[in-house]
Curated annotation (Swiss-Prot):
Catalyzes the reversible interconversion of serine and glycine with tetrahydrofolate (THF) serving as the one-carbon carrier. This reaction serves as the major source of one-carbon groups required for the biosynthesis of purines, thymidylate, methionine, and other important biomolecules. Also exhibits THF-independent aldolase activity toward beta-hydroxyamino acids, producing glycine and aldehydes, via a retro-aldol mechanism. The keyword Signal does not apply. It catalyses: (6R)-5,10-methylene-5,6,7,8-tetrahydrofolate + glycine + H2O = (6S)-5,6,7,8-tetrahydrofolate + L-serine. This is Serine hydroxymethyltransferase. It comes from the Bacteria. (6S)-5,6,7,8-tetrahydrofolate binds at L119, G123, H124, L125, S351, P352, F353. It comes from Alkaliphilus metalliredigens (strain QYMF). NCBIfam families: PRK00011.1 (NF000586). One of its GO terms (biological process) is tetrahydrofolate interconversion. It is an enzyme of class 2 (transferase). PROSITE patterns: SHMT. The keyword Cytoplasm applies.
């Protein structure tokens, strides 16, 4: 993209953009929630649509002059519905968190009981963490994973649900590497008369191409981010049954937000169109192949994987046998240009600020064109960093070679 005007007016911000672009080009991005959007998505985000206020919804705006942005929002809504075979879509949430809070606001009263996945077992802040508005406003009861298999025990979820009698059950995770059985969650919700909400933010791209069970078949409400595996701009969306359309739309506007970000909604529409293209399935298939290949090679190098592997795009690594914390590992990897994030593991003895694990994923490296052979090299680099720090120059060389071979935004 051309930043000539910005360079002349605000050299400081121009420098930030240039340095961040250089960082992205010169590092291996393994944070599971990050990806690289296309130039088309960025062009839509940087368009004149950023100038338009459009409170309300298409054909029901509180401002004049919304004819063109109505077209953009309808394109985004219709493409998203087609992508997930959903009855209704709201593309206005500014984030996945706003999408989640919007569903709660539409369906719950303060103090209502909700079942959500324990944050330290792979859930998300907005699934009832006491430091989040979800945990402060609602009575969240947590379910987790089995202490041995580190997988969701659906019989235990049923037991907790029958005991807690929640008004809503939230399924979905931010650090759970295995496929989630939404049909079983529907059965549990029906058994206790609860709404079922699925947060598919991490796996939306996999769901879109049929590589993971589609929650829209089972859930009353499905929330998502539009980035991560979906590879769109940063934002959120809600899918629901048509009978809930009015309460969801009302909860987002005027309930939670004011004016929608029309430039971001246009960029969402572009990303959804990309996801409807045949090549998007091949991309997602490679994401999973890469995650599995990376996991297998890491196991060969002596790393412990939570649940012993992955069905998705992400891996959770237990570093306790390596005698290093997630916090320290994140720093060491960052020094050679491998970006990961420290992450709690199930039943973690460390604090969330230190952690015993790291979370990694393959969406971004797959976007760059890397495949299974490159995953083996990356695993080798990770092993050097943790077990053979005296060979750090070798690791740096491999990182540089991979980044030079697989170009980004050039």
């Amino acid at each position: 993209m051309n930043f000539d005007t910005l360079k002349k007016f605000d050299e400081e911000i121009y420098e930030v953009i240039q340095k961040e672009t250089k960082r992205q080009r010169g590092s291996i991005e393994l944070i599971a929630s990050e990806n690289f959007v296309t130039t088309a998505v960025m062009e839509a985000m940087g368009s004149q649509l950023t100038n338009k206020y459009a409170e309300g919804y298409p054909d029901k705006r509180y401002y004049g002059g919304c004819e063109e942005v109505d077209v953009a929002e309808n394109l985004a809504r219709n493409r998203l519905k087609k992508l997930f075979n959903a009855e209704h879509a709201n593309v206005q949430p500014h984030s996945g968190a706003n999408a989640n809070i919007g569903v709660y606001f539409a369906t719950l009263e303060p103090g209502d009981t909700v079942l959500g996945m324990n944050l330290s077992h792979g859930g998300h802040l907005t699934h009832g963490s006491p430091v989040n508005i979800s945990g402060a406003y609602y009575n969240f009861v947590a379910y987790g994973v089995d202490s041995v298999t580190h997988r969701i025990d659906y019989e235990e979820v049923m037991r907790v649900a029958q005991e807690a009698k929640p008004k809503m059950i939230v399924a979905g995770a931010s650090a759970y590497p295995r496929a989630i059985d939404f049909k079983k969650f529907r059965e549990i919700a029906d058994a206790v008369g609860a709404y079922l909400m699925v947060d598919m933010a991490h796996i939306a791209g996999l769901v879109a191409v049929g590589l993971h069970q589609n929650p829209c078949e089972y859930a009353d409400f499905v929330t998502t981010t539009t980035h991560k595996t979906l590879r769109g701009p940063r934002g959120g969306a809600i899918l629901c049954k048509e009978k809930y359309a009015k309460i969801i739309d009302k909860a987002i506007f005027p309930g939670l937000q004011g004016g929608p970000l029309m430039h971001v909604i246009a960029a969402k529409a572009v990303a959804f169109k990309e996801a409807l293209e045949p090549g998007f399935k091949a991309y997602q298939e490679q994401v999973i192949k890469n995650a599995k290949a990376l996991g297998e090679e890491l196991k060969k190098q002596g790393f412990d994987l939570v649940s012993d592997g992955t069905d998705t795009h992400l891996l959770l690594i237990d570093l306790r046998n390596k005698n290093i914390t997630g916090k320290d590992a994140e720093r060491l990897f960052d020094e050679v240009g491998i970006t990961v994030n420290k992450n709690t593991i199930p039943f973690d003895p460390q604090s969330p600020f230190v952690t015993s694990g790291i979370r990694i994923g393959t969406p971004a490296v797959t976007t760059r064109g890397m495949k299974e052979e490159e995953m083996k090299k990356i695993a080798g680099v990770m092993n050097i960093i943790i077990d053979h720090p005296e060979k750090v120059s070798e690791a740096q060389k491999v990182v540089d070679e991979l980044c030079n071979q697989f170009k980004l935004y050039e």
